[in-house]
Amino acid sequence: MPIDALGRTISGAIHDRIAVNGTHLHYVSLGTSGSPILLVHGFPETWWAFHEVMPVLAERHRVHAVDLRGFGDSDLANDEFDSKVAAEDLHQLITALGKGPMHLVAQDISGTTAFRLAATHPDAIASFTAIEMGLPGFGMEAFADVTNGGAWYFGVMATRGIPDMLLAGREAAFVGDYMFPSMCAVPDAVGEGDVAEFARTYARPGGWDGATGLYASVLKEGEKIVALAQSDAIRVPVLAIGAGGGPFTEHTMKRAAPGTDVRSIQIGGAGHYAAMEAPERVAAAIRDFVGEVDAARIA
C-alpha cells in the first residue's frame, strides 16, 4: 500500500514501505514501463540523493530508489546490521516487487552491499552500475587511515554510539557544512532543502546506526569480498562511473569483477556526489548503459 511521503518528494513518485528480512524498507517508485532499475544511495544520503536522476530514467524505465535499513524512512538498524544483511534486504525487496531482474545502481558506502547482492544473487540482477565506489580488500580501507590522508569520520562512523554522542543536534551542520562541501566540486549542488531532508532522518535516535553497520563492514570484510571477487561471481555487465575520485571506481571494479565486461565513464567537473552534482549526465550514462544491456538481452 502506498504511503504519504514523510519528507520531500518528487512529482508523480509513489512512496511505500515493505516488510522484508525482518525489517521494513522505505522505497520510492517512478515510471510505469520499461525494465526496472534499483537505485541505492550512499552516505550521508537517503533515496533523495537520486531525486533529479529518477525523472530522467523514468522516461524509459520503472525506477525504484530505496532507503537502506537504518537510513531515511526505513526501520532502524540493530547491532547485527552489516553489508551481508543489507544485501539480503535488497534481494528480498527485488523478489517482493516481482518485476524480474533489476538493473542495480549503487554508490559510495553501499558498494559492499551492492557487490554482495550482485555476486550472491546473480539471477536478481541484470546489470551493475557503480558510482564513485570502493570495496574492502581493494583499497577502500585506506580511506580510514588518517595518518596517510584518510578521513577522520570513517572510524567515528564505524563505532556504534559515537556518532549519536558527537553529532546529536548537529546533524545538519555535519551533513551540510562539512560532508557535502568537502567532497563536492559543484557549488550549491546540495542546497539547504537537500541538507534538511538528509538530516531529518539522521536526527532520529539511532539514526546513524545504518551508516555504522556499513562503515564497520568496510573495515572487517575485506577478505570475504576478495574471496567473492576471486570466484568470478560477478557475471553481469558492469558500468563504473567516476567523478571526484577519478578512475578509482573503474580500477576497483575491473579488479573485483574480472570475469565480466567492465565499462567506464568519467563525469568531468563533478565531485564525489555526482548524482547530486551532475544528475543529468549521471542519468544519461545509466540510461545508455542499461539500454545497451537490455538490447543485448533481447537479441
Regions flagged by a language model, labelled:
Residues T32, H41, E52, E80, ...:
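Residue-level detector of alpha-helical segments with a strong bias toward transmembrane helices
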Residues T46-W47, T112, G271:
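A short, glycine- and basic residue-enriched loop/turn
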Residues N21, P44, K84, E280:
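Conserved phosphate-coordination/catalytic loops
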Residues A270-P279, A283:
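Catalytic histidine-centered segment of alpha/beta-hydrolase-like enzymes
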Residues W48-H51, P55, E88, F115, ...:
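Surface-exposed alpha-helical interface segments used for non-catalytic interactions
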Residues V28-D73:
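Conserved HGGG/HGGXW glycine-rich cap/lid loop of the alpha/beta-hydrolase fold
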